[in-house]
Structures are given as C-alpha cells and as structure tokens.
UniProtKB/Swiss-Prot annotation:
Cysteine methyl ester: modified positions: C512
Domain of life: Eukaryota
Gene that produces this protein: HIPP41
Coiled coil start-end: none
Protein's UniProt name: Heavy metal-associated isoprenylated plant protein 41
GO CC field: cytoplasm
Entry keywords, A to Z: Lipoprotein, Metal-binding, Methylation, Prenylation
GO MF terms held by the record: metal ion binding; rRNA (uridine-N3-)-methyltransferase activity
Length: 515
C-alpha cells in the first residue's frame, strides 16, 4: 500500500485508470536508456501495474547484466511478465540507428546519471570531455525519437565537477530547450538503486548528493534559427573570400517547369554620380554589369532614375543572392511585387560595397520600355477546392494581389485562372496553400491579345430568327434543338440502318431542314 500511496490515480470518463508516478504516466510511451540492474524501470512498472508502455535498454548484454548485478535477473523477469520491451547492447549515442527504436516515437526518453566510465578523476578535463561526448550523443539520438510535445529527462548531479558538463549547452546543439529543472528524490521510486556500473564495485551504489532532473523539449524554432545562422555565416565567408565574383557570377539555372516572370530581361538604366560620373546598368547573357563612365557633357534629366533589382534572386538563385538578401531586408518591397527600387545614393552604396545603413529610401516606379502591356500573364493554378466557401476565399486572396486584373474558376471547380502583369506567383501560391488548400502551378504564359468584338452574323440589329424545328440534334455536336443560323459548314447526317419515315421537307440555304 505504501507504493500505491506514492502514485496519483486519475480516472477518466471511460473508467480507464491512469497512474502517475512523479513525472511519468502509465499512458506515456517511455524509453529508458543506460539501465544498470533495471531497478528504475522495475519501480515504474510495479507502480503502473503494467509495463506495456515501457522500453528498457542497457549497454551490457543479458549475460553481463545478470553477472554484474544480483537483482537484475529478478527485475528482468518481472518486467518481462508485465509486458516490457527489453533491449540489451544498446549504445546511448546511436539510439536513432537501432533497428528496434529507429521507427518508434516516445513521450519520455530517460537517462539517469549518465557516465562514461571511471577512467581517472572526475575533475580531469579529458574525462569531462568523454562525459560530454556521451551526453551529446544521447541528446542527438533522443531528439529524433520524440513524439510531439515529447520530453528528454536526464537526472544529474548539481555540484562541481559534474556541473561543468553543461547539459543545457549540449542540449541546445541538438535543438532541445530546457523547460523545467526539478529536484531528484530517490524515495519517489521505491526499489530503485543507483549503481556504479563499472569496475570491481559495479554493483555498489554511489553517493547521489544534490541532484536534479533536467527536462528538455525539442524546439523547431531553435532549429530554424540555427539553420539561418549557418546560412549567414556561409554567406559572410563567401563574401570575404570572393568579394568580386559575387556580382559577376553566372546565375544558377533552375528547372521551374514554368517561365519566371522576374528574369534579367531588358534591364538598362543610368545612375548619376555627382555631375560627371554615370553608372551604367545593363544585362548581357545572364550577367548583370555595373560600368562606371566618366564624361563631362551629360544630359542629366533626372537625379533619380528608376533602376530596379529582381527580388526573386533570393529564393531562386542562391549563389548571387547574398547581396540581394541584405538589400531586401533593408529595403522593404514596394507596391510592385516583382521589383525592388531605391534612390541613387542608396543603390550606389549598395553596389560599390560601401552600404551600411540608409535611413531614407525613395520608392520609384519602374518605367522601362521593355516592360509594358507586352508582359501580361495568364496563370493557371490547380487547387483542391471542395466547397463554395473555399472558392470565394481563394478568389478573394488572388484578386487582392498587386498586378491581378481578373480572377476566374474553370475546370471542375479546381482551376484558378489569373490574368494580369507582374504577379508575385511565389507569394500567392504560398498564401493559398496556407489559408485555403493545396495549390499546384500548371501553366504560366503570356496572355493572348484581346480580339476586337466581331459583328454578329445576324446583321446590324442582331435580331433573333424565328424558332424552327431542325434535324441537327446530334449529341455533343454544339447545336441546340432550336438552333440559330451559325457560320458552319453543312452538317452531314449519318443515315440510319432502318427505313426512314416519309417526311415532307425543304432544305434552306443556311443548312437547316424545315419539316
């Protein structure tokens, strides 16, 4: 009864019994790593009344375990009877490669008092390094075996030299964040005996002293921040090693399966530097050239000429986008989604590598002869729109994007057709996927030119002819039962194998037969 008093019983509405032992529930899938005589897992299983949710593992084989520890055989027998999964020869640093663990996910992964072995004094830097390598390997493997909201628990001593292991720093390198640190009390787990596990006194307990249980949880935000940090470091290294090759490097080609709207086409312009210098911006064979020209007699018609850079360089052409990325963060996109524009002073500093920070940014309209009505687009997006509400929402999102002139639904209510120019397709697709449903790009092409209205064949007043009964009622022929005069060739009726009825009729010049 004393053991039962230590557990908390929670009964849900279905009558099933959930047993809590400190931080662990009978409904949790629990993995225990580095078990000595399996007394900790035996304690949990006894309090739960079942071990079907427990997977207990040890580094030693079964024969070594029962030879080292006196109570190991009885503990293993009890765990097996209660339904536990017992694994031997499991390396704590390669959990995610173990064939019995790599495809399983757990709510709690527990490692009590990790230790790399007694190979000297605990204060030796070499031994501390071995301990840290062991714990880091465990964190790396355990973080890959967690369920959503799963936790990694490590019980550890608080005082030096054990505090020099710095568990929080090791966990952060595996994108695990500390969510709680609670005192470890051995009395909460009746029957648990901590063992030295190595040497002649392997079955003897060691002094615990002041200990804590560190609870860690996987953080996707930490992983994304680390990836961004690595990318920025690589960009800085590339800039420092090859400062001149960044602007003149050939853009990387990608097979997008559709034509990008933001390629280097017809990009040309001038930027005035004072009164005599001009920076000429031009495009040739995929390269973007910056040329300084010195002249005295220059007709400077404006101090700010609309020069722009393509914003999709950041996502489509990584190798030359390192400058553009900085440029994009400092200079927010204007109302034209496919371009970034800036004042002359800002752009010159940026191009010449002297850019630090510019407080005033002037937004300019792009005004090149190469970009006009000839850049209209027709975009077809395939969407899984199941109801009318999702259709309306998709059309509302698309119509609000800059550059979109018309939006329509075609096909079996699964194709969103857009007409316009300068549409930011990547941003639109991303927003539709997030707010409506899965979206796939089918085609991106130039919109066909608008045809002038054709005069109706019925004449100036477009009069409706009188209704007439005709014989052109062939399925899928495009004619209706009471057809109007259409500029089509004479229709050939396939003769019937049966003898036709006697009909009196006359043929009209427009191809209809009047009964």
């Amino acid at each position: 009864m004393a053991m039962r008093e230590l557990s908390q019983l929670n009964r849900d509405s279905d009558g099933d019994e959930e047993v809590w032992v400190k931080h662990y529930s009978s409904n949790h899938q629990i993995l225990l790593v580095g078990e000595g005589d399996f007394s900790f897992s035996h304690s949990l299983a006894t309090l739960f009344g079942s071990a079907s949710n427990i997977c207990a593992s040890s580094l030693d084989s079964y024969d070594v375990v029962v030879r080292k520890y006196k109570k190991a055989r009885s503990n293993l027998k009890t765990l097996k009877r209660l339904g536990a999964l017992l694994l031997h020869g499991v390396d704590a640093t390669t959990l995610h490669f173990h064939p019995d663990l790599r495809y399983r996910r757990f709510d709690r992964v527990i490692f009590n008092f990790p230790h790399a072995g007694f190979h000297g004094r605990e204060s030796d830097s070499s031994l501390i390094r071995k301990h840290r390598e062991l714990v880091f390997g465990f964190f790396n493997g355990a973080s890959r075996l967690l369920r959503a909201n799963g936790e990694v628990h490590v019980s550890h001593k608080n005082k030096a030299p054990f505090s020099e292991w710095n568990l929080e720093e090791l966990a952060s390198r595996c994108f695990l964040v500390l969510i709680q640190r609670v005192a470890f009390e051995k009395n909460n787990y009746p029957g648990y005996e901590n063992k030295r596990g190595d040497g002649r006194r392997c079955d003897q307990p060691f002094l615990l002293g002041e200990c804590s249980t560190f609870k860690f949880r996987f953080s996707r935000v930490a992983k994304e921040l680390y990836a961004e940090k690595v990318r920025s470091r690589e960009v800085k290294e590339r800039e420092s090693m090859y400062p001149e090759a960044i602007l003149n490097k050939q853009p990387v080609s990608f097979d997008h399966r559709y034509r990008l709207q933001t390629e280097f086409e017809a990009i040309a312009g001038t930027i005035t530097l004072g009164k005599s210098k001009i920076l000429w911006l031009s495009q040739e064979k995929g390269h973007l050239h910056w040329i300084f020209v010195t002249t005295k007699n220059v007709d400077v018609y404006s101090s700010k000429i609309p020069v722009f850079l393509i914003c999709t360089l950041e996502s489509r052409q990584r190798d030359i986008a390192c400058f553009v990325k900085t440029f994009q963060f400092k200079l927010v996109k204007n109302h034209y989604p496919n371009t970034l524009t800036a004042g002359v002073e800002f752009l010159v500093k940026f191009i010449t590598g002297k850019y630090e920070e510019c407080q005033q940014v002037t937004y300019l309209r792009k005004n090149f002869s190469g970009y006009g009505d000839g850049n209209k687009q027709r975009i077809v997006l395939k969407m899984d729109m199941s109801d009318e509400k999702s259709m309306k929402k998709a059309m509302k999102i698309a119509s609000a994007k800059p550059g979109v002139r018309s939006v329509s639904i075609q096909g079996q209510n699964d194709q969103l057709v857009l007409l316009g120019e300068g549409i930011d397709l990547a941003e639109l697709t991303r927003e539709l996927k997030k707010k409506v449903c899965m979206t796939t790009i089918i085609t991106v092409q130039a919109a066909p030119p608008q045809q002038p209205p054709q005069p109706h064949p019925m004449g100036q007043y477009n009069q409706m002819p009188p209704a007439r009964r005709c014989t052109c009622e062939i399925p899928n022929s495009g004619f209706c039962g009471f057809c109007r005069s259409m500029s089509q060739p004479n229709y050939q009726v396939v003769p019937s194998p049966y003898y036709p009825p006697m009909l009196y009729c006359r043929d009209e010049t427009d191809g209809c037969r009047i009964l």
